[in-house]
Design a protein with these regions (language model features):
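TRNA-recognition modules of translation machinery and tRNA-sensing kinases, especially anticodon-binding
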Residues: 1-210
Length: 210
């Protein structure tokens, strides 16, 4: 899980149930379903079949976080994955599937926010810009974000601290740092969503999962 979702994420740093069993082995209860889906995809040889492969799963997960309305420490995650395709159509298809699911459940007043975090090359340049911006206001950041500044400054954009949230509003926008290929990809995702009459807004501060 640490390799899959990153050492600097809240899930790894604050929310995983990790303990040693009676045999002295380190045990972690599954905090999310994606890593297990990828492992199953590889171990069962689906990567050797015709691609892309589309899968779905429903599994129980556990996170040590503050219980609140609608959020428990044991929960179920329903996920869909499209392995073997980097097509913007695949991204739009999953978004459309999510909308269709909520529509079928009769859920109203939903809003869709999207963003692109580009490729590793894009993010490297963006990290530099963020680090420069947040370094100038480091003394105002919460202790957690001060630690994130060197390791993964993008995570500061996701901080729940009111002060950090306000500072992040003036930060550089990731879309401005996308390379030509990533920019075209994001534009095509938007084109496909519009073709299906799916309304959305772009939120450049969505960086979950990094």
């Amino acid at each position: 899980f640490q390799r899959g979702i990153g050492d600097t994420t809240d899930v790894v740093q604050k929310e995983m149930y990790t303990f040693d069993d009676k045999g002295g082995r380190s045990i972690t209860l599954r905090p999310e379903g994606t890593a297990g889906a990828v492992r199953s995809f590889l171990e069962n040889g689906l990567c050797n079949e015709a691609l892309p492969q589309k899968v779905c799963y429903l599994t129980s997960c556990y996170r040590y976080e503050k219980p609140q309305a609608g959020r428990l420490r044991e929960f179920h995650q329903f996920g869909v994955e499209c392995f073997g395709s980097a097509s913007p159509l695949a991204d739009a298809e999953i978004i459309a599937l999510a909308k269709s699911l909520f529509d079928s459940l009769g859920v109203k007043d939903l809003s869709l926010e999207i963003n692109s975090i580009g490729c590793p090359t894009c993010r490297a340049e963006y990290h530099k810009a963020l680090k420069e911006y947040f370094s100038s206001r480091k003394d105002e950041l919460c202790d957690t974000c001060k630690g994130r500044l060197d390791r993964n400054p993008m995570r500061i954009l996701d901080c729940k601290s009111p002060i950090c949230h306000e500072i992040a509003k003036g930060a550089p926008v990731v879309i401005d740092y996308l390379c030509d290929e990533c920019r075209e990809h994001f534009e095509m995702v938007q084109k496909y969503l519009k073709a299906q009459n799916i309304e959305y807004t772009i939120n450049p501060q969505i960086v979950r999962g990094l």
